[in-house]
């Protein structure tokens, strides 16, 4: 209901300010409120994988840890404070959720959950078909445990950080 007739402002933390941090973005909340913004849509905020990384900074859609934040942006506590301050100022916070794939070195792979990914005939984790996707690994939504872990990560961000929703 709170999305009806709301003004949504998309934010890429890395490019929003010279510092590219949650703290620097938080300082601009009053200006965004004056502009009439109601909902802040944050582009992916998670740590970016290292394996097959594209460029120096990597692809923010190559998520390494769904419960973490990109350390370039600050700490999880910095993010928590940003969300709290945004709520005080009347904003809702939604996150661009990367649900189809993760980085090939996502913590789930390190924990031995290779079966949470689509595998090729040799048992190797697959990148999505088509395009230049070598920096991401396609998730296997037929695996119930993976779906539960994905939901758990989303619940964590809602219950522990107070995020309002996901795109």
Model-predicted regions and their roles:
Residues 1-7, 14-23, 27-38, 44-165:
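Substrate-binding/active-site clefts of carbohydrate-active enzymes
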